[in-house]
Amino acid sequence: MRTYDLKTGKKKIRWGRFCLIAVLLYIAALTIPYVQHKKVSDHYKKQFDPQECYSEEPGKERAAYITDNTEALEYRLKMIREAKEEVIVSTFDFNADTGGKDVMSALIEAAHRNVHVRLIVDGISGFLDMLGDPYFQALASTENIEVKVYNPVNLLKPWTMQARLHDKYVITDSSMYLLGGRNTTNLFLGDYGKHQNIDKEIFIYAKEGESASLKQLKAYFERVWELSDSKEYRCKKKTDRVQNSLKELEERYPKLEALYPDILKTWDWEARTVETAKVTLLSNPIEAKNKEPHMWYSVNQLLQTGKNAVICTPYIICGKEMYADLKNTCEQGTNVEIITNDVQAEPIRGVYRLLEPKRKNLGNRCAGARISGVSFQSYQSSAH
């Protein structure tokens, strides 16, 4: 953008206006690809049958509900310790803090036993936490360990920035997995800080070989792992810092055994779990772009199979399509209770205060749209 300077007779550039236009264009590239919500294809609608998620007979899979952060860390350490062939870890956020180093140490110990370890982390954490970090470099440099980053941050491709990997699970061999909302940080694992998220996870164990939902999860992981959006994270050079970090992580494991002696004992997995009829996992498309809302469609179909249903979520933001779906579900005869986090209980209160009007607006919109079957509760902690 140029203007004419009357004093000098020269043209000058109005950088402020130029920068403003550039910022607006960048924001447009960041948001416009996601403004128009995709519709669920007829192919997926025909493929998904909610009745296939149920069974009248007891299944092979057994489940446990993990709510305590220290117990969640112990489960990870024990599962990894017992692994003989393979460990798979997927997480949105992975920090090289105390809890994160505990998990790294366990993964390295497993790799030294010739267990194949694969770790995938979201690109935001890959950029903020892993880039150049000597502990993650040490992890990636270890034989039998592979690390990938899903959709790494690329400021030259803002249209990909909203596509994030929020999957959080641990799989060991073909017998068990842990899945839920816990990231691999002090906020979610162990008792290492003043502030903690009281989170929820499901542990699934199958005594008789690989279970149906475990096959689902492993197949899902393989698709994400092989995706072109998932990039390899490598240690380019084993510097002194990296070697010292590796030594620290290796020497950490005996201390973990002393700190968490239960992982040395034999665990009766059957006694720790309860019988289930059937476990089914649902997911959205995995590509780093605007996606068909397979999850929301599936959830609505499942809601309509019962008279009373509960949705537990840290927060909820509905578009017009979601309001219409909720109204339709309630008109089908289902009463829906939605439990969200209380904004005052959130560790990251600033973010959730921005979302609180959305939650209140959902209640008002449901009332305005006469969706009488929807009620709301606030959970007095932080759960995901």
Protein language model features and the residues they cover:
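Charged, low-complexity intrinsically disordered terminal segments
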Residues: 2-145, 156-166, 172-384
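Lumenal/extracellular "mature" regions of secretory-pathway glycan-modifying transferases
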Residues: 148-150
